[in-house]
């Protein structure tokens, strides 16, 4: 089983600094990166060996998300995906099944040697901000966002407003209320 995969969903053109992000990802060869989006990746090829691009339209991703829930989800623009990040373990569970941990990452997060900063204790969740959060990849933990304590994912996924579900008022608070081990820097 591999240790960690980090997921990013991005739509539109990658920013000018994306090549720097790719270089920082390449330097973290023990971590895989899954990129979902509709961007033209050809000018960045060949991608580093640990970076995988999954071409998907925003509409197809919305359809995939909707298919996993029994209520209408609201996802008017790609930026709203920040509230769906805690559900990536559930939404992409087939893609990440061979990893011990999964996380979400923003492509404006230029990495140093990330593995040096990963705690060696057994936490269910690492870090507290949306640009980089890591979760233990278990069936229960990947559905933790659905727990009744803290923000209600149904309300979060049913509004066009950004609720910061991926950060302090969302998942960090939920894990704290559920008394689940997390490392929040």
Predicted segments with their positions:
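Short, acidic, metal-binding catalytic loop of nucleotide-sugar glycosyltransferases
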Residues: 22-32
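Short, solvent-exposed loop/turn segments at secondary-structure junctions
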Residues: 11-14, 39-42, 58-61, 108-111, ...
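Short glycine- and hydrophobic/aromatic-rich loop-to-beta-strand nucleating segment
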Residues: 131-137
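Short beta-strand/turn micro-motifs composed of small residues
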Residues: 8-10, 35-37, 105
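GT-A fold catalytic core of metal-dependent nucleotide-sugar glycosyltransferases
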Residues: 83-127
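N-proximal low-complexity "stem/linker" segments adjacent to membrane-targeting elements
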Residues: 1-20
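Catalytic core and acceptor-binding pocket of nucleotide-sugar-dependent glycosyltransferases
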Residues: 143-185
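Active-site-proximal specificity loops/subdomain of glycosyltransferases
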Residues: 38, 42-97
